[in-house]
Amino acid sequence: MDLRAMNSGVSGLLAEQQALGVVGDNIANVNTVGYKAERAIFEDVLGHSILAGTSSGLPGAGVAIGAIKQNYTQGSLNTTGVSTDVALSGDGFFVANGSVDGITGNFYTRAGQFTLDKDGYLVNPTGLKIQGYSANGDGTYSASLSSIQAPTTSIQPRATTAATVTANLDSTATPPTNAWGDTNTTFASQSNFSTTQTVYDTLGNAHTMDLYFRNTGTGTYDWHAVMDGTDTNSTGSLTFGTNGALTGATGTTVDFAPTGADPMTIALNFGTPVAAGAASVAGSMTSFASSSNVSSQSQDGYASGDFSGISIDGQGVVTGLYTNGQKLAISQMGVAKFRSNDGLGRAGDSLWIDTRDSGPAAMGTAASGGRGSVSSGSVESSNVDLATEFVSLIQHQRSFSANSKTITTADEMLQELINIKR
């Protein structure tokens, strides 16, 4: 009697058992961040070698699991609100460098549950360092990958050297009767309008700079600078054309000697003067027949600041945040892309490695070259569909039972054959 049926049944049991393990692995990882569901690929087994010219009616010898493939479709994004949590929307993998089971090098992950370690490195839960392109400080980034490290030390203060004021000065304002510098009257009574900015010295101390503007009644406004309530004797004038556009500016620096710090010279920028009759340039002072008001003002100084954390934008740019409100670019996260994701090898801990089948990693940045964008404060959920997995459980259970029935039937037939001799 041919025992092929029994062998086929055994192969079916083994294959279904292995497939059931795949389903169980999926269900177990339903809450694993960045996990990609697996599926078992069944292949038939021939009882003979394939030879040229043989009959197409070769007998089968059961079934085997030919491969276990992962499904790399996008998982849903789960908002966490944690600034170091990131997710990729689209193709690609974050790059993590370190050692896993004695293998040292780059590993690839979709699980963006990152943190800053004690040395400021951005790391995954197992301590692998996330790779990126370091910021050069001039808006460009290095050409090679390195570990992303936040400079957790304090940022040094920067003295104010330039300040910008954009405002409208009412052309119909009545010139004040009190003269500049009259010690018996206030600065406010000597002017029509004023602005206030906080500026910083070389030690990072804050100072209040008040600019007072006085209409002369001749298409000109004089300005006067006061620092911390004390007259700096820094003055100048702004002239305006008949259309209200700025046509000239004089005396555009403020000099101040703070106690214990280096003397300060602040260059004032009131905008770009134009020729008489020309239209005003955006961002310049104006003098129209409307109430005086400031539209914008800024200065380039700041106090010292302590590191307070990082932010990550949609292109993976990692920015250091400081308590003084400053932001400094640190790095841009590297994103790896492969010719065939199916060829990647699993390394555990939500990591993959490149193989000959996947091809080498093509390094780049988020939202470029077909790579996905980065979502900060979110993680990518597992793409396991529980409903599908439960259906697969039932299918594999039924198939397992059917294969066991094949074995018992073949056994009964063999027993009948043995009984013939009796």
Q: Model-found features: residue ranges?
A:
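Acidic/polar, glycine-anchored loop/turn motif associated with catalytic or activation segments
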Residues: N403
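Structured functional modules or segments
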Residues: M413-R422
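Amphipathic alpha-helical coiled-coil segments
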Residues: L13-E16, L20, L386, L393, ...
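Small/polar low-complexity and glycine-rich loop motifs
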Residues: K36-D385, F390-S392, S399
